[in-house]
């Protein structure tokens, strides 16, 4: 009897793009990426939905393209979320161990106790991530099941979000005929994809610079300790270039991606770049030194906000023994690692997702870190979910027609 294929699917709904990935889970729980779709995102600002219809259309297009490539239809997704409405805090729950030996039921009760906190009425708990356990006086326990004791403490990192903001994201997903089985904070997903266990143990901060937000996650002693979402990202750099160079936004985005340099100290500056004019105005030549000055000012501002956030969190840069890991689209910019090392006075590297099978070569860039981390999270949840249908893929409403979808699939594939 032929074994049923096991699929997982994720949605990374960002300010600049919506990305859908479909993975096939192998017998050894390794993931082959078999479907990829992406669409420009015009219905979000700083990670929050501002236009339901535009967001729905982008999700449909991305999902349709991923389904066509994978030749399967998905019904359930794991979704990444960000936005300046996100809050986080650390909490602790305590329970008596029943029968003197820790069971999963004891752990569940301890986590629920930790979640019994006062939060603003307009916020809801999105996730509670276990940091470690304490059994009686034994600290730093990571796998407590089966251990003997009287009292179980669990320390958790709790993430909350604005109820209406979360509902708007879920509404967009449901209008596409999908169910979101879990919502995961985007910096947690990025950390899952790009960090090593040694970095998490020593102390590290992952900085994911996306289009609309800069997301940070601090790990220490193997667990998440602090998360934050800063409402500033690569789109501000694009707007800075557009205003300073008096060029359309699309042209500014192209210039940022192809010629952008993060620091004025980068070697080889001086190349002349053609900058299109607005409307019928003629284009002109601008030195890459000018671009670097515009871009570095904004990046320095973003890194300054990150430094302040780390200081407020109780995890200043001095405790980050493994340094900084940059990821997200902006982290691919020339000179940004050296610029970050100068500002943070820490070792810095660019983080790309770990290798997977299937379309791995296509997605092993920092732009896909969040989506790959979401795939890992979806894989852990996968056992209890209904599976998608193989074979002919029915088109979702608003998908743009079969020919349009086929054209996008070819563009994504080659």
UniProtKB/Swiss-Prot annotation:
GO terms for biological process: cell division; FtsZ-dependent cytokinesis. It is found in: Cell inner membrane. One of its GO terms (cellular component) is cytoplasmic side of plasma membrane. Disulfide bonds: none annotated. Present in outer membrane vesicle formulations which are used as vaccines in human. Belongs to the FtsA/MreB family. Cell division protein that is involved in the assembly of the Z ring. May serve as a membrane anchor for the Z ring. HAMAP family: FtsA. This is Cell division protein FtsA. It comes from Neisseria meningitidis serogroup B (strain ATCC BAA-335 / MC58).
């Amino acid at each position: 009897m032929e074994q049923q294929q096991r699929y997982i699917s994720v949605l990374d709904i960002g300010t600049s793009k919506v990305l859908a990935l479909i993975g096939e889970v192998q017998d050894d729980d390794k993931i082959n990426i078999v479907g990829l779709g992406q669409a420009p995102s015009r219905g979000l600002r700083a990670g929050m939905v501002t236009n339901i219809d535009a967001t729905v259309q982008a999700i449909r297009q991305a999902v349709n393209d991923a389904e066509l490539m994978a030749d399967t239809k998905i019904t359930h997704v794991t979704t990444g979320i960000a936005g300046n409405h996100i809050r986080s805090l650390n909490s602790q729950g305590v329970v008596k161990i029943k029968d003197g030996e820790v069971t999963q039921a004891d752990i569940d009760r301890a986590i629920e106790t930790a979640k019994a906190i006062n939060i603003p009425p307009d916020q809801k708990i999105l996730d509670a991530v276990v940091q470690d356990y304490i059994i009686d006086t034994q600290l730093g326990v990571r796998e407590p099941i089966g251990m003997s004791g009287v009292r179980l403490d669990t320390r958790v990192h709790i993430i909350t979000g604005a109820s209406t903001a979360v509902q708007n994201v879920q509404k967009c997903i449901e209008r596409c005929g999908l169910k979101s089985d879990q919502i995961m904070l985007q910096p947690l997903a990025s950390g899952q994809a790009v960090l090593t266990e040694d970095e998490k143990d020593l102390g590290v901060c992952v900085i994911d610079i996306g289009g609309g937000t800069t997301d940070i996650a601090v790990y220490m002693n193997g667990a998440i300790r602090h998360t934050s979402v800063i409402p500033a990202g690569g789109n501000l750099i694009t707007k800075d270039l557009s205003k300073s160079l008096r060029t359309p936004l699309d042209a500014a985005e192209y210039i940022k991606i192809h010629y952008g340099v993060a620091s004025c100290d980068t070697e080889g500056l001086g190349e002349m770049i053609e900058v299109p004019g607005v409307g019928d105005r003629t284009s002109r030549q601008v030195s890459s030194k000018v671009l670097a000055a515009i871009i570095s000012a904004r990046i320095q501002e973003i890194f300054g906000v990150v430094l302040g956030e780390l200081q407020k969190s109780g995890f200043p840069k001095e405790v980050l023994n493994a340094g900084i890991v940059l990821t997200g689209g902006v982290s691919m910019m020339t000179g940004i690692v050296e610029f970050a090392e100068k500002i943070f006075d820490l070792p810095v590297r660019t983080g790309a997702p770990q290798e997977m099978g299937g379309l791995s070569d296509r997605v092993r860039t920092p732009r896909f870190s969040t989506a790959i981390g979401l795939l890992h999270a979806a894989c852990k949840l996968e056992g209890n979910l209904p599976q998608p249908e193989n074979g002919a893929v029915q088109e979702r409403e608003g998908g743009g027609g079969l020919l349009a979808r086929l054209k996008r699939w070819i563009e994504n594939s080659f």
